[in-house]
Amino acid sequence: MKKRLIWLLPVLVGFLVFVLFQTVFLLGYVPSESMEPTLREGSMILGTRIYRELNNGDIVVFEHNGELFVKRIAAGPGEEINVEGKTYHVPPNAYFVLGDNSENSFDSRYWENPYVSEDKIIAKIVIPS
């Protein structure tokens, strides 16, 4: 009986960790310098896939045109934001995102559709390293 438990416990723990990272948490890294100095390129981040709400200032991981991005929410649904002399009106269920390193960030300012749909947000960052 003890021999069975010796190998069963690590398998169960490994399975539980796998399930948690597929459903609740996101462990990743920052792919570029667009979020510096807040998040350094290559630094590890921990996000949660389960959150109550998103607010301006939150850092999120999202999918845009088949790529994953890490950016900060600058404006939320129904808000208006003026960036570099241009006014944006954020539609319902969408967000306007910017990188902290504005000179080195490919973000909402440059996209044909500058808004990130709520359903494209994968996680809210809770622990940057």
What are these regions (language model features)?
Residues 1-129:
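Extended hydrophobic leader/signal-anchor segments used for secretion and membrane insertion
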